[in-house]
Amino acid sequence: MHYDPIKNVFASLIKKYPFLRITFYKLLDIFFLRSWYVRRELMKLRKAFGAKTIEIYDAGTGFGQYSYFMSKKLNPTNIFSVDIKEDWIKDAEDFFSQIKTQDIKFNTEDLLQINHENRFDLILCVDVMEHIHDDIKVFSNFYRALKRGGFLLINTPSIYGGSDVHSNEDESFIGEHARVGYSQEDLVNKLHPLGFMTYKCQYTYGFWGDKSWRLGIKYPMILLNFSKLFFIILPIYYLITFPFTLLLMILDYNTKNKIGSGINFIAQK
């Protein structure tokens, strides 16, 4: 299954009206459990910097929802948000200009080719690395871009059921993925030789979270991939299922998962 065609539908719907984009951001924050985990860690990292202005690199900003959150909740900040999709960057740039946000700048960048030097205090990389074959090159670029003591927060599927792969015979549920995901050991083995050290690691989407993802994300996406007409019945579907999905998400969020289909990894330079 491919997410990008569905993402492009949403991108076209929200591009003209700021209130629609803000509403869309809030819905993403509610429906995607990974957003719960990422936002919690961002708030904790903000405290680690005290009152100083932090320079943030949103590496693979997508719709721009995390840049919006960080601009609102992590102040004072200067945020540099990039994505490889030029049209999405243009849409995000127009939106933040309309709502008169001054602390975010945008650019189209390929993470394999960036050459920032000792520029950022924090790099946020959410659901990006599973799309990139040469991940070591990107991690090396991130290390060079960070200031000494800076943090890299990676959120990605794990090898334990990420992309809905549970055995060697399974294919990734997401067609755009270059790999199934990572384990803690994978990330340690790739990041530590570059000079990073592990600050924190947490598996997400454990027993409860995996069930919430299937009910709240996987099954609706399968329907939408089959036909965009299913957009019409989505509100009814979520009206029936979301109370159960929300309960499962809350259970996962408050559980220390020994293993899970997602992973939050924070490295420090």
Task: Locate each region found by the language model.
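Conserved SAM-binding loop
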Residues: 39-46, 54-165, 265-267
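Short, flexible hinge/linker loops that cap or flank conserved catalytic cores
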Residues: 50, 73, 257-259
